[in-house]
Amino acid sequence: MATFARSDQLLVIIDPAARETDGESVRIAKDVLSAGAAAKVCMPDGPEEFARVLSRRGSRRPVVVGDDGALVRAVTFLHRRRELADCVLAMVPVGGALGVAHALGVPTGAVAAARAVLDGVERRMDLLVDDSDGVVLGALRIPPLAAVAQVQVPLPAKGWLRPYQHLVRSLSARPAPAPAVPGPPARLRVEVDGETVVDLDQPVEGISVTPGGPDGLAEVEVRPLSVGAEATPVRAAGRTVTVAGADFRYRADVGVAGPVRRRTWRVVEGAWGLTVPGAG
């Protein structure tokens, strides 16, 4: 793990949703970071400006102040520009959805997280990358919430953004709030490293795929539909996971995608770096 010096220059990117949700935590994060390092603070108004700021980071270490969605947006942007491997991210979690950040080892309190940015260490993280260039940091779930809508944010067609319009448009689609209603059982074929784990003749209640397992493998759990007694989950581990069958949607961290009839995810071991508290 690499350690960081307080002399590092920081680029603090404050997501607009964080400012609206918890302005006090944002203020605390700014104060702690600015007192401990040379920090340039940016407050983008939306996803396109968020991307512009991140693309112009130079040698500064990016610090995302926001929720899980902001972290996923930053990782996705850097991945699609093929700059993720060489850019160590840091995060101060502020907002409603913080489960991914917490699971990755980021402290949930503003003060503790800001101090980890200043004094923490780099931890290399595995990443799931699908065949449409989407990413999963924490967990993939099938099926997701039952009802999800997405709203596209209009983008300007001039200036610096032209080369990145398609990328920023895809990152700016946000799912609308939806009730936590489980979907119906699905008939899906699940393959792990080319071996069939569950076939179409076995309805399933849910599938989860999580990166970060031993030896750079993804951990897969399939929950078959049961009548009466609860069925034992089927577990496997591998570097590629393919799901195919009738149209299905899936939740990747905080975003919902689909419907698709086939999707393959592969593990990229140590794909990105995240600043977390040191062992001491």
Where are the predicted features?
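Soluble catalytic domains of membrane acyltransferases
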Residues: 49-55, 76, 80, 130-131
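Catalytic core of DAGKc-family lipid kinases
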Residues: 83-207, 211
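ATP/NTP phosphate-donor binding region
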Residues: 1-65, 72, 111-115, 274, ...
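Short Gly/Thr/Asp-enriched flexible loops that form oxyanion-binding sites at enzyme active sites
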Residues: 69-83
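Short solvent-exposed loop/turn micro-motifs enriched in small/polar/acidic residues
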Residues: 57, 120-122, 181-183, 234-236, ...
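Hydrophobic alpha-helical membrane segments, chiefly transmembrane helices and signal peptide h-regions
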Residues: 11-14, 63-67, 74-75, 89-94, ...
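Short, glycine/charged-enriched secondary-structure capping and boundary segments
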Residues: 26-28, 77-80, 104-107
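ATP/nucleoside-binding phosphotransfer catalytic cores, i.e., glycine-rich phosphate-binding loops
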Residues: 201-280
